[in-house]
Amino acid sequence: AYLKEKGLVKNSTSYYMRIWRSVYNLAVEQGYTTDKKPFKHVYTGIDKTVKRAVPFKIIKMIKELDLSFEPQLELARDIFLFSFYTRGMSFIDMAHLKKSNLQNGILTYSRKKTGQRLTILWEELMQEIVDKYKDDSSEYLLPILRYCDINDRKQYKLRAKQIGRGLNKIGLRLELKAPLTFYVARHSWASIAQDRKVSTDIIREGLGHDNEKTTHIYLASISTSQIDRANQIILKGL
């Protein structure tokens, strides 16, 4: 109930329940408690996620929108595109990217959700966005958070709301069937990868998924160089 009140979807709450179940089972195994089966009626499965992907032509339309007189919408659009360019990077991970995460043409970061470390070959499309919002006084790579360790949570929540509102307006303007969110960027990257004959294994690694089942949920509703090559194939034409 607590996680639901915080806005987490069923699959996310299930993910945390599976972690707690593992910890509890370990405690039982080591004799710290008896097995009272507290998770007997707790949902720990995975629901089939509704596909949110849009085709490549819609991504291109979003990129080509003239939003020069609407800076809030322009920022929202650019952060959405950066997510797509970086294989569906989540908003929280983008918000906390620092300039130090980019070294020698490689962007390296750890997913907040799983702790998994991912590397992405830096592309010109990504650099265009960074250059557009360049701020020498900030340690952050993107213009989401401005100041390190000063009301970080407050800054994050405010920017998430502003950018989310901007994406919603863009989606309405383009008359999309579903709300435009960062899930759309992630699902679209996976779907377009599949359309361009990228293997499921490479898509899975690119998304940072732990198992192939999760990847198939995205698609159906290796080496770093292979993933980077796949991303170049997906971004071609933008």
Feature-to-residue mapping (PLM):
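N-terminal DNA-binding recognition helix of tyrosine site-specific recombinases/integrases
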Residues: 5-38, 87-89
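DNA/chromatin major-groove-contacting recognition/catalytic segments
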Residues: 119-124, 128, 132-133, 217-238
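Flexible interdomain linker/hinge and immediately adjacent N-terminus
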Residues: 2, 29, 33-66, 147-153
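Short, polar N-cap/turn motifs at the start of nucleic acid-interacting alpha helices
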Residues: 100-108, 177-178, 198-217
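Catalytic-site neighborhood detector that most strongly recognizes the C-terminal catalytic loop/helix
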Residues: 53, 111-115, 207-232
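C-terminal catalytic core of tyrosine-transesterase DNA break-rejoin enzymes
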Residues: 81, 85, 89-93, 186-210
